[in-house]
Every structure is written in structure tokens, then in C-alpha cells.
Amino acid sequence: MTNIFKQIVSEILVADHIVITSHKGPDGDSIGCSLGLYHFIKKLNRRVVVCHPDVAPDFLRWMEGADDIIAFENDPEKVKSELDSADLIFCLDYNSPDRTGKDMQDFLVSAQGKKIMIDHHPFPADFCDIVVSDTACCSTSQLIFELIDQSVNVEKLDDRIGTSLYLGIMTDTGSFRFPSVTARTHEVIATLLKAGVRHSDVHENVYDSNTLDRLQLRGYAVAEKFEKIPGFPVALISLTKEDLERFHYKKGDTEGLVNVALSIDGINAAAFFMEREGEIKISFRSKGDYYVNELAMQHFSGGGHKYAAGGMSVEPLNVTIDRFKKLVPEYFA
């Protein structure tokens, strides 16, 4: 990919105004790759802003540059203005414009600037001028590292860029335990550590900075809302709006909860359903010979990787869960 990465850097160097976008529901990789690229472009002395559909959760707000992110949910006119005036738009960690949300996607698609997709999800939509799509890569943050490494040199790395990319790789690999991790991933991490990344600080900020409400919500979810599907190695956890209100839910409090269900002995696939205003947010995880991306794509308006996918439903929570249960024999027998 060296040639395409060099082409992308050439586009950066001649651009007057660059906008970095990512998907709705920000996670460690979307924040990490966006800020990693943001700090890199700033080192090249180009004008750049980050525009995301919504605000980062609290456990990611400590990142340097996170407060500079313009959230569409807070200031849609500002995001529209930035997109309209951009001559280069990065689409990071998503494969289709609808992943930015039904409102922001219209402004993204109509923007006239050249669009560059860098992503690791399958089935990229045809809406960008330059596409880097590598489903074998563990994270988009690692792809941003490769962009820097193969087109310029790693001397352009500093602790701000490195910390951002480390965050994205760490979170999207489940702290380096998912099958997507390769020897190259560890080589990249070694380079980031040499650049000054304080890896223990990143882990502590993400995983060891809980509020009491967050821990109590997660305990309640496992103790009271966990359900195993009889006859199948499948489990689910569901939370209603009332559950969330009871524990003073804040964005990010349920991050990784679906993995807790998957970690239980004998469970090979898990789903998490969270009731929000007007829709149900769904997360799927699996392991071994059980895949969830087709289920998410075909039945829950979503998609993702074989072992990690997401979706949504506008049906009531109980109806959505019943529909999932009826699909279990087809996908997880």
C-alpha cells in the first residue's frame, strides 16, 4: 500500500482545508485514528479539523485534542460549514456514509471535497475518491500508523500521535487478545512505545476510571438482565431506558458489556440490546466458528466484522429481542 499512502500524503500537502470524519457512536478506534491523523496533519502545517457525528464518551475525553472535535449533535451548522469548505475529507473507520447518522450523512455526501476512506470493515460503499480498505488489519488506527510509516517516516511520530494510535489499537483488539492481532500489530506497538507512549496510563484512563454508577449499572446488567438462550451457546443482555435512568447512565457506561456476556463459560455468541429514544442499539460479539456480521447486516440494519458487529432496530425492545431469539437457530446452531 506504500504508493497509495504516498498519494494520500501528497493530497494532504496540497490541501487548504482538511476535515476528518468518523462514525456515529465513537469508540476508541474512531477517536484514536481521528486524533492520530489530526496531530500528524498539524505537524505538516495544514489546516485540519475533526468533525464527528456525536460527542466522545467520558472515558475517551482525556485524549489530547478530544476537546477540539466538533460534534454534529451539538453544532450541525458548524459541521456543515466545515464540510462545505473542505477540499479534502477523510472518512475513517466506516465503510458507508450512513454510518455517520441519517442527518450528517447528507452533508457528507453533498460535500464537494475529495474524499478518502481509510477503514478495516468489509464491503466498502462507493462514495470516496481514494479507498484504503484492509479487513485483515486489526484497526483503522494501525492503518493510520502504516500511512505515516510507509509514506513519510516514523520520525514524524510523537507521543500525541502515538498515544492516539495506541488507544485505537488497544481498544479495537480487546487489549491485544482478538484474532485480528498479528506480529505486525506488536511491531507497531513497539514503535509507539519508543515514541514515548505511556501504555499503562492509556489503559488506566480507559479501563480503570469508573464511576460508582457505571459499575453498579454493569453489575445489575449481568446479575439481573443476563439471559442464556436454551439449547444454544448464545446469551444476551438488555437494558431499558428505565434501567439506564436508574443508574444515571452516561455515554460509554455500557462499553464492552457485550464482551462480558461473551466471556462466560460456554457462550460463543452474545448480543447486547440498549433502549434509546426512538431506537434500540445492538452490539454483537462472537468467537470460534460463530459469526455475527451477516446477522447484523441482514436483519438489524448494521454490519461489521465476523466476530464484532452492530445494528439497530426501531421496533420495541421486547419485539427486537424476540426477533433475535427466533434467528438464533439459523445462525448459531
Task: Please give the residue ranges for each predicted region.
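Short glycine/serine/threonine-rich phosphate/pyrophosphate-binding segments
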Residues: 28-34, 97-101
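Short alpha-helices
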Residues: 118-188
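Short, conserved loop/helix-junction motifs that constitute active-site signature segments
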Residues: 83-84, 105-113
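Short, structured coil segments at secondary-structure junctions
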Residues: 63-66, 111, 127-128
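Hydrophobic helix-and-loop "lid/oligomerization" segment in the mid-to-C-terminal part
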Residues: 2-24, 32-64, 68-70, 77-80, ...
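Short glycine-rich anion-binding loops that position phosphate/pyrophosphate groups of nucleotides
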Residues: 24-26, 94-97, 121-123, 241-242, ...
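Short beta-strand "acidic-cap" motif of Rossmann-like dinucleotide-binding folds
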Residues: 49-50, 117-119
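Glycine-rich phosphate-binding loops that contact phosphosugars or nucleotide phosphates
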Residues: 88-104, 116, 123
